[in-house]
Amino acid sequence: QPGLTATEMFDALASGAMKAIWIVCTNPLVSLPESRKIEKALQNAKFVVVQDISHRSDTTKYADLLLPAAGWLEKEGTMTNSERRITYLSKGINPPGEALSDIEIITRFAKKMNFSGFDYASTEEIYREHALLTKNTTIDISFLNYNRLQNEGSFQWPVPDYGHPGTPRLFTDKKFYTPSQKAIFNLPTAIENTSEAPDSNYPFILTTGRIRDQWHTMTKTGKVSRLMTHIPSPVLEMNPIDAYKAEIETDDIVIVSSKNGTVRVKVKVANTTRESVVFLPMHWGKQLDNDLNRTNNLTNTLIDPLSKEPDFKYTCVAIEKYKK
């Protein structure tokens, strides 16, 4: 039985169908769409647990219980990146204070609840269980153990036997994961855009994303003064033609509005976006308890029916010059 997706969980908290939530390693009050709705959902929750390495994220303010987690250098384990590469990460230092690794927190909780199957002696034992689940699949790492990872370096899966060097490139044997083992190319018969269409009230399409020096919701990178010198606050990138028509110039302050909320930010006029499209970075949350820089005030909760990914790249907005 599949559980709820991220956006569905907060809908359930808001309606009262779900009473409690345990948030691990994420800051949904900044990262999820329609932030003010997320905030109301957290306020409505009966019990909120936040497990993170930062106690200063926007979400931790709503935590009834804050579980301090260990950072990457403070715990042992493996990491798999987007090129299928598995790397062993050794523990360098002990975590500060009461902080524990995510694994330790979860296993301690499970044992307190008398759940079975959590009597792991080490992270290696957990990895071994995970690896065995991949046996005889297209992502087989059942033969890749800690010893090889520690002594031979990283591997790209699949690693289907003990002496296998890993698979830097897939399908070099020209055998694909189809019944015929031949590649199948499916051309779309139609292009379906279910996003809300711009109109006279909200004529611009807002797309959101990242900038060079910040990572996600800035709980780590936002503390590094040098990283804040490049772009110290969120800036709306606007096409020169749109800016000319609206009599807006670089460094002007504008109000950006959608059906979900508003933000107030500076403008940068640039050819980085096409006409009628504007860009705003998603990293900033509340500043001095004010949410006028929080981009996800604007975004909508429309999600893809298959992936459940929110429609972060397409929100209809209006833009007007700010007047004191």
Feature names for model-found ranges:
Residues 43-47:
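A short helix->loop->beta-strand "cap" motif at the edges of active sites that frequently abuts
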Residues 21, 48, 66-68:
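Short, well-ordered beta-strand core segments
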Residues 27-37, 77-80:
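Glycine/threonine-rich flexible loop motifs
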Residues 1-14:
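Acidic catalytic cores of enzymes that act on phosphate-bearing nucleotides/polynucleotides
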Residues 17-29:
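Short acidic, glycine-rich surface-loop motifs adjacent to enzyme active sites
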Residues 53-90:
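Flexible glycine/proline-rich, aromatic-decorated loop/lid segments
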Residues 126-226:
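Long, low-complexity segments enriched in small/aliphatic residues
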Residues 4, 96-152, 217, 221-237, ...:
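Long, contiguous, secondary-structure-rich segments that constitute the structural scaffold
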